[in-house]
Amino acid sequence: MAATTTIPLLLLLLAATVAAAAAELSVYHNVHPSSPSPLESIIALARDDDARLLFLSSKAATAGVSSAPVASGQAPPSYVVRAGLGSPSQQLLLALDTSADATWAHCSPCGTCPSSSLFAPANSSSYASLPCSSSWCPLFQGQACPAPQGGGDAAPPPATLPTCAFSKPFADASFQAALASDTLRLGKDAIPNYTFGCVSSVTGPTTNMPRQGLLGLGRGPMALLSQAGSLYNGVFSYCLPSYRSYYFSGSLRLGAGGGQPRSVRYTPMLRNPHRSSLYYVNVTGLSVGHAWVKVPAGSFAFDAATGAGTVVDSGTVITRWTAPVYAALREEFRRQVAAPSGYTSLGAFDTCFNTDEVAAGGAPAVTVHMDGGVDLALPMENTLIHSSATPLACLAMAEAPQNVNSVVNVIANLQQQNIRVVFDVANSRVGFAKESCN
């Protein structure tokens, strides 16, 4: 009798284990193997960081409705995942972006899009364009829909409304898109009626645009976790591969199942109503080696009114600190390195030195301290970047761009590589765990 009851119990446990497993996708970076060295590649990528940082630190222009821009004045994210869109599924490489809500894809026909490999709505039986009467339309900034008639009390009949259309800037260009829905496939998971922007034309240079589209992983109603409902239980994580590992991939895990690491240390996730897509955390201090960095009081304080605080972002390349924080960090780092020939600047980096002149172990590690007792000790690869041709290394962080809105610190993807970062929106927390992602 015991055996007959044990077998069904084991089957139930097995089914629960399978159901709890997280979906997993490979994550690739955009650094090409022919690049001269990781240092030169990162310098080139970091040139576009300033525009993204200004976007992250600026407040929403209007109050009221919570909107999700199809795109922004940001630089393209550095990492991509393979996803399927449509029925039958069409494979696309979508840029991974934790600071954007909306997903969008370049759609055919589009003679000005940056890639010839476009999503073809005509080949998908589940594709549908969405009219201005769609409840999703007001959530997108920049929609071109007719205003309500009859003194603002009555709207045109749904059948007479055009497709909800957009024209939005992105980097140095802008694109025109229509609101649509289709089946999004991530690994073995299928999410029907997924709302996204279908890009039909691009104006301006396309060099800095994602080649095929973007996957929005922010916190707003248009983002993946919101549209997926209970499928992923409000949790995803990623482990980003090193810029040095051209031929290796990291992973994006969706869901709170067994695929997420057990040794995660969590810090509370803060929310800014003006930038509700962003993942804010409360940094309490920095240390270089065993020395705490002396920063002015309140330098890390979260302020929803101004946007000040610290954001964890997948699309910014190098970590930026506001002027007083970075000045103090740089001073302590230089004091400990004590490079005999001093320091030079290279691209965005102002603390580069000759490694031949510094004793072994002379470059100290940087640790980011957060609420909840989280001490994110950055590996040396995440602290310094090296030239492959010369004995030159640079502190892989920089000062935030000087602008009235540049009040936000950003923990960027270079400092996150080979670390599992868990975004647990359901429990309002962000977690970190060491992991070899390559």
Swiss-Prot record:
InterPro entries: Aspartic_peptidase_A1 (IPR001461), PEPTIDASE_A1 (IPR033121), Peptidase_aspartic_dom_sf (IPR021109), TAXi_C (IPR032799), TAXi_N (IPR032861)
Signal peptide (UniProt feature, chain positions): 1-23
Family: Belongs to the peptidase A1 family.
Function according to Swiss-Prot or TrEMBL: Anther-specific aspartic protease involved in tapetal programmed cell death (PCD). Directly regulated by the transcription factor EAT1/DTD in anthers during tapetum PCD and degeneration.
Broad enzyme group: hydrolase
Pfam families associated with the record: TAXi_C (PF14541), TAXi_N (PF14543)
Active site as annotated: D97, D313
GO BP, sorted A to Z: proteolysis; regulation of programmed cell death; systemic acquired resistance
EC number(s) per entry: 3.4.23.-
PROSITE patterns: PEPTIDASE_A1
Molecular-function GO terms, alphabetical: aspartic-type endopeptidase activity
Name listed for the protein in its UniProt record: Aspartyl protease 25
Glycosylation site list: N123, N193, N282
Domain Peptidase A1: 79-433
UniProt induction comment: Down-regulated by chilling.
Organism: Oryza sativa subsp. japonica
